[in-house]
Amino acid sequence: MNFNKLKFGDTIGIIGGGQLGKMMAQSAQKMGFKVICLDPNPDSPCKSVAHEFITAAYDDEEALHELGEKSDVITYEFENISAEQLIRLTQKFNIPQGYQAIQLLQDRLTEKQTLQKAGSKIVPFLPIKEEKDLNVVINQLGYPFIVKTRFGGYDGKGQVLVKNEESIQEAKDLISQQECVAEQFLDIALEVSLTVTIGNQKQITYFPLQENEHRNQILFKTIVPARSDKEQEARDEVNKIINEVHFVGTFTVEFFIDKSNNLYVNEIAPRPHNSGHYSIEACDYSQFDTHILAVTGQNLPKEIEILKPAVMMNLLGRDLDLLEDKFANHPEWHVHIYGKPERKPNRKMGHMTILTNNVDETEKAMLKQFEGRE
């Protein structure tokens, strides 16, 4: 991969105008780059910060071509862009990330097969094309198991836990919609993730291991550094993956740690990730900074310095009234509100990060402030 080193004033095109696109744009602008964004929602968060905004569907070939013509480099904030369209774009325009990661990882089955080929430690899985395949799953994996759709799904959507024969109907309903993947259920002690940036000359920069807690399948909070001894093992797993998949820019690998302290790769997000948002305040470079450095052909920092341990919490729609009531009395809360036009109870509307020398006490105090949060 040949990198074009961008200069001040050059333009970065971003496919996707959500909060990740917005935070990419903010990092790009402080480095002197211009930003043009494409998103079908005319009120998406990135519109408020982009120099230019194209309101168009992600599969609008003419609009994507316009984005390419106006940009010196193109990046993307999410993995659900059509791989076929991305292939065509890479033939005409400068897209250092390429299409392979998207092509492999937007399908849960090819993602699992890729991890298997890389030698990653993953839980046993089986493909499900139709309802009758559940018999094979029950015989080989046994109860309980998780059924996930091959395509789409985020924040727990598109997946069901099958505990026994009585709970299998929900899985059948999911399979009737599209092909799925079944995974053996894992008794999880801890969830962690590792955010990584790859740049020119195969430079690689690791962020600290992140400890995550999900509630109702949505990331609730992240603690950094993770209270785990698995950081080096997680890096080793990432190194296996990058030998198999082409990455440029920031991506995140999510892991499970079971109750016997075994580490398993869960999934890969080929772009900046929710669990890395703490890095904006807690590190000398954020995950968005390093992403922009990578796609614009600049050198990456050799190491990421944690300025202070941190607790990051997602802010959902139902949290905002409470936040507004208490925010004035908590200057230690670094609050980011994304600017989404519609507030929904379970929708990510922002996040906040607290820097601390006592993670345990800060975590308890934060939970007390948002008591009753599920």
Curated annotation (Swiss-Prot):
What protein is this chain from?
Answer: N5-carboxyaminoimidazole ribonucleotide synthase
Q: Name one matching Pfam family.
A: PurK_C
According to its UniProt record, which protein family does this protein belong to?
Belongs to the PurK/PurT family.
UniProt GO MF annotations: 5-(carboxyamino)imidazole ribonucleotide synthase activity; ATP binding; metal ion binding; phosphoribosylaminoimidazole carboxylase activity
Q: Which residues form the ATP-grasp domain?
A: 112-296
**Binding of ATP: at which residues?**
108, 148, 153-159, 183-186, 191, 214, 266-267
- Specify the pathway: Purine metabolism; IMP biosynthesis via de novo pathway; 5-amino-1-(5-phospho-D-ribosyl)imidazole-4-carboxylate from 5-amino-1-(5-phospho-D-ribosyl)imidazole (N5-CAIR route): step 1/2
Query: Tell me, what does this protein do in biology?
Result: Catalyzes the ATP-dependent conversion of 5-aminoimidazole ribonucleotide (AIR) and HCO(3)(-) to N5-carboxyaminoimidazole ribonucleotide (N5-CAIR).
Q: Quick one: a GO cellular component term?
A: cytosol
The positions making up the signal sequence are none
Q: InterPro entries, alphabetically?
A: ATP-grasp, ATP-grasp_carboxylate-amine, ATP_grasp_subdomain_1, PreATP-grasp_dom_sf, PurK, PurK_C, PurT/PurK_preATP-grasp, Rudment_hybrid_motif
Report the catalytic activity. Answer: 5-amino-1-(5-phospho-beta-D-ribosyl)imidazole + hydrogencarbonate + ATP = 5-carboxyamino-1-(5-phospho-D-ribosyl)imidazole + ADP + phosphate + 2 H(+)
Enzyme class (EC, first level)? ligase
The catalytic activity of this protein is classed by the Enzyme Commission as 6.3.4.18
Q: Which UniProt keywords apply?
A: ATP-binding, Ligase, Nucleotide-binding, Purine biosynthesis
Q: One GO BP annotation here?
A: 'de novo' IMP biosynthetic process
Q: Which gene encodes it?
A: purK
What's the domain of life for this entry? Bacteria
Give the multimer and partner information: Homodimer.
Enumerate the SUPFAM superfamilies for this protein: Glutathione synthetase ATP-binding domain-like (SSF56059), PreATP-grasp domain (SSF52440), Rudiment single hybrid motif (SSF51246)
Which organism is this entry from? Staphylococcus haemolyticus (strain JCSC1435)
